[in-house]
């Protein structure tokens, strides 16, 4: 039977037998009331979730053999805020990373007497299982200047480890953050000065607040994709993206190309609003790339969006275009979804 005689049937067969189409169906939301989600698939076969809890008072971890099981997995509080001083308020955006033979948690924290005077901090654990052992405070991760700093992530490329994070630029306004990158010389410190990669400039990045924050990195197809989130944390929140060649000097701002439009934004059609603060993981076999992010399933919020608990952890497969660029599409509706959407 030739393709000309059965185009629809044959194309359907190709689609259903592709790696993306056979990815395990995901059911959204994965976990309710968990914002800023970061999921890592470790070599032990477990997915680990670190995310912001609505109380902003602790760091929780949970693990499961599948993404869908994270919602019913036991959550363990591995660290709690201090009563006063540094690390005593606004515990935000924890990220779990295995570096060498230890686990590290990078997180944001303020002070009880100045809750929005946030900085970056690090915890360390030598146990094989990060839900066990002892998490040791390793102090503030210094960025080179003191100002509002949050949302640290780390990645390695060609033997070099990098830190990316958001911070108010020197001389920047109170409600402005930009995304920076620097090389790391240890898991606890950066080496040399930081490079500013993106600051708010487009209208969709400056709704209510001038915000670029929450960088996340995916290396694929000879490129480094760095997503980030922009604007206020309500329905205006949206994802942007920077792209560089994986052979480029990542500390050269000119090596990066910035998308002029959001790569994911609110969708009335799917009923999901304010998607962002994402991370990346894969299917268990590593064949399907998966976007993990938070969103609300309603648009209008009463009061301060930061006090609203309903940013839910969600996930969906990533589609890849013929030119090697990711197509995140729109946030999918609540319920099951498995195939990448365009």
How would you label these PLM feature ranges?
Residues 6, 22-342:
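Carbohydrate-active catalytic/glycan-binding domains of CAZyme proteins
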Residues 7-18:
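Bacterial N-terminal signal peptides
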């Amino acid at each position: 039977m030739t393709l000309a005689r059965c185009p629809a049937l044959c194309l359907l067969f190709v689609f259903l037998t592709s790696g993306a189409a056979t990815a395990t169906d995901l059911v959204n939301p994965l976990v309710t009331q968990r914002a800023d989600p970061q999921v890592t698939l470790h070599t032990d076969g477990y997915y680990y979730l670190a995310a912001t809890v609505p109380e902003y008072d602790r760091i929780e971890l949970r693990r499961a053999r599948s993404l869908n099981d994270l919602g019913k997995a036991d959550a363990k509080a591995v660290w709690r805020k201090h009563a006063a001083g540094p690390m005593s308020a606004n515990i935000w955006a924890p990220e779990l990373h295995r570096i060498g033979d230890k686990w590290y948690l990078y997180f944001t924290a303020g002070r009880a007497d100045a809750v929005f005077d946030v900085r970056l901090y690090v915890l360390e654990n030598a146990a094989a299982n990060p839900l066990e052992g002892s998490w040791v405070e390793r102090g503030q991760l210094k960025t080179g200047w003191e100002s509002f700093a949050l949302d640290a992530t780390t990645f390695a490329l060609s033997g070099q480890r990098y830190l990316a994070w958001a911070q108010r630029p020197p001389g920047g306004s109170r409600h402005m953050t930009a995304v920076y990158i620097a090389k790391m010389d240890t898991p606890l410190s950066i080496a040399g000065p930081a490079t500013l990669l993106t600051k708010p400039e487009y209208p969709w990045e400056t709704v209510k607040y001038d915000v670029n924050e929450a960088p996340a990195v995916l290396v694929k197809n000879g490129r480094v994709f760095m997503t980030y989130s922009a604007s206020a944390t309500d329905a205006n929140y949206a994802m942007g993206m920077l792209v560089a060649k994986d052979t480029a000097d990542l500390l050269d701002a000119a090596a990066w190309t910035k998308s002029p439009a959001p790569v994911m934004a609110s969708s009335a059609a799917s009923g999901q609003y304010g998607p962002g603060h994402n991370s990346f993981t894969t299917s268990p076999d590593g064949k399907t790339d998966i976007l993990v992010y938070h969103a609300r399933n309603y648009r209008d919020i009463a009061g301060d969006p930061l006090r609203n608990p309903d940013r839910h952890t969600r996930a969906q497969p990533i589609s890849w275009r013929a030119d090697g660029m990711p197509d995140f599409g729109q946030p999918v509706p609540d319920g099951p979804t498995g195939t990448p959407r365009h």
